[in-house]
Amino acid sequence: MKDIIVKANDVEYAYKKNSDETPKVLVLKELNTEICEGEFVAVIGRNGSGKSTFARLLNAILIPTRGVLYIGGKETYTEANLWEIRRTVGMVFQNPDNQIIATSVEEDVAFGPENIGIPSDEIVKRVEEALRSVGLEEYKKALPHHLSGGQKQRVAIAGILAMKPKCIVLDEATSMLDPSGRKEVLKVLRDLNEKENITIIHITHYMEEAILAKRILVMDEGKIVMDGNPRQIFSKVEEIKALGLDVPQVAELFHELKKDGYNVPDNILTVEEAVQCLAEMIAKA
């Protein structure tokens, strides 16, 4: 049985407003979930559903105002645990330009290990391994501001990999990228998950990205309201739409075909699956 890397027990989080007199804004409510090591989980939900707050709790940037969150078996509210928790979970944020601080790619990737006192020879090894993992070995001497958006996010991921995390959380990390950049980053994430068993928690509003995960958490009004694999989640087209979310175009097409009386599956997600299914229907006609 795989170890549990994230466990939330009745977690709530409330933001304080400007003054003590004004009420707190409760953005997470009675949140309960478990995520095992090696899972690839997408988290979706409309704006204001609590996705980004949940992401920041996972790295102990924020601490629950109620309930208990365990990361790698350690409670985030215990200050003595924070160092280890932040080494266990790395964060990649929305804007790649806000995460790169050095004047060369290799210096940026080395920044984290240098700041925790890793020996120089080990840092060199980690930088090379991290850049190889994200496919940027040939760019190690490059100036970060000369890179594309997708390449910059891959540098940010490499910087986290150099810290040897067990889990990477991406908070809308592809939202500012063009389709090519998103494709680059998603390939890296899948490789890290499948080849290196790194847990991936991907906060996204792109449904075509969510279907690449092995599990999807759907959030609404601070709660996890749906939990399942992509086929289970996106077969519930009307429920997803009622939550203010889009569904993958292929899933919506087959939902409409089914409503019109066609005998088609309700769990088709990709263009390739759609082509095969429609070809079989035509052949039988």
Swiss-Prot record:
Keywords of this entry: ATP-binding, Cell membrane, Membrane, Nucleotide-binding, Translocase, Transport
CDD domains registered for this protein in UniProt: ABC_cobalt_CbiO_domain1
Membrane topology annotation: Peripheral membrane protein
Organism: Acetivibrio thermocellus (strain ATCC 27405 / DSM 1237 / JCM 9322 / NBRC 103400 / NCIMB 10682 / NRRL B-4536 / VPI 7372) (Clostridium thermocellum)
Protein name (record): Energy-coupling factor transporter ATP-binding protein EcfA1
Domain ABC transporter: 6-246
Compartments, as annotated in UniProt: Cell membrane
Family: Belongs to the ABC transporter superfamily. Energy-coupling factor EcfA family.
GO molecular function, one term: ATPase-coupled transmembrane transporter activity
Cellular component GO terms, alphabetical: ATP-binding cassette (ABC) transporter complex
